[in-house]
Swiss-Prot record:
It catalyses: GTP + H2O = GDP + phosphate + H(+). This is Elongation factor 4. GO terms for molecular function: GTP binding; GTPase activity; guanosine tetraphosphate binding; ribosome binding; translation elongation factor activity. Disulfide bonds: none annotated. HAMAP family: LepA. It comes from Aliivibrio fischeri (strain MJ11). Residues 2-184 form the tr-type G domain. It is found in: Cell inner membrane. It is a peripheral membrane protein. The gene is lepA.
Amino acid sequence: MKHIRNFSIIAHIDHGKSTLSDRLIQVCGGLSDREMAAQVLDSMDLERERGITIKAQSVTLDYTAKDGETYQLNFIDTPGHVDFSYEVSRSLAACEGALLVVDAGQGVEAQTLANCYTAIEMDLEVVPILNKIDLPAADPDRVAEEIEEIVGIDATDATRCSAKTGLGVDEVLETIVKSIPAPEGDPDAPTQALIIDSWFDNYLGVVSLVRIKNGSLKKNDKIKVMSTGQVWGIDRIGIFTPKQIDTDVLNTGEVGWVVCGIKDILGAPVGDTLTHAKGGCEERLPGFQKVKPQVYAGLFPVSSDDYENFRDALGKLSLNDASLFYEPESSAALGFGFRCGFLGMLHMEIIQERLEREYDLDLITTAPTVVYEVVLNNGDLLYVDSPSKLPAVNDLDEIREPIARCNILVPADYLGNVISLCVEKRGVQVDMVYHGNQVALTYDIPMSEVVLDFFDRLKSTSRGYASLDYNFQRYEASNMVRVDVLINGDRVDALAIITHHDNAQGRGRLLVEKMKEFIPRQMFDIAIQAAIGAHIIARSTVKQLRKNVIAKCYGGDISRKKKLLKKQKEGKKRMKQIGNVELPQEAFLAILHVGKD
């Protein structure tokens, strides 16, 4: 056991986590050169296309150190985006140490800080590594000082490497063996195995990634899932070298995968404990905190026949992504679907894209909203995650919106732009600290402003240099209103949005203008209105198509023309009373882009 090292690789987006993982796999011979590919751990098509890590992946490698001993390295490559921070905290729970990878050109960024603090809170050994030292812009000495000043870890002897060229990777491996402690645990105690992650395989059922804390697991063992008390037999057991390889046993301190033929999606939840059915342990391991979704949106299948498939797909996906929340919802405009909770807008995009690709579904998304705390006149407290659930105005006492504490790291040159962006987003400054050329800003900004497009705007105002990390702080009373959209006088529930009173007029006008572009012209006028309660705040009209009925009158009497025009007008009026307007998918998406341009 003293030759096992469990560690995660944590870093900000694009600081080279996945590339470093590739080099470690290559040096330790986990894959042959023929099988090696760039970012070999990013196995999802989506991850490769976007160049980001979404799922944490684990790998077991054998490394012969310079002292002649062979060490087993279990490491987990984690995502860098703030939307996937839950993946990171889960991965860290299975480790004794973490490699903090910092780009020697970019320096410390907000996500570096957030992930590093998570690791320190869990009592992990954090080992700083300066990556990308082959770049002309690299300044490792400055960055080492920055790590010490901002993060508070001594980085004077930090290992310097370039994951792309392979320079210094051997030193990284030696540092891992020397600096990261071996796992603790008792091989003879009753078995306790923590489920770090699980996914659904169409042939094998539920596959669980586990870390053995005490005891061991063997093939054909009878095991019990502690939360449900169900007993299963282990069909297959093994490790990833990134390839899935079968073994006969997993010992204390090791990380590997287990297949028990569980077909029920809820059969082995993430964060649960596995033990032997006979003579197993009594206590569960402390799992993970449940994360609260920050953004909610309705997802509806375009064709109602897909509803069952959609439900199954969501179930399988939520097994793999424990931070996804969903509950059934119905809408007059869109039929049956689900109200889903996400950690942020990127998370929402990724989930929608995964559902459409992996499960072949066509989906419509409604406007994302955050959760509001609503106080009614009779003193009752409600939590509202959808504009359609907001009670009538005369029943409301006050609406409280969630406030996010945002930590922003930005180079001093772009400070002015970033501050004006925060003010525009109704932010309140809490703190501002200079660290050399970097400025650490702390702002309290309403969550609804943060999740919509704050991240994109922050990147564009700072030319990509500013970085952001945010978490929910508190609820605060605010003047929020619901803006309804009426098409020819009928409310469309799926198009309503909740926004601040000061922005309502502007957003209402933008919304109706955007919708006008997407609704095709009909044989009658279509009035698109935005309203707060009964008060109309904006309107635009999609003009009717009309035939030139007087084309056949050559000259002739004006009364003849008037008669024909009047007849046409009456026909249009009749049509408008009975005509229905078909809203295309793009009209629903128009909401998502309001305020972005």
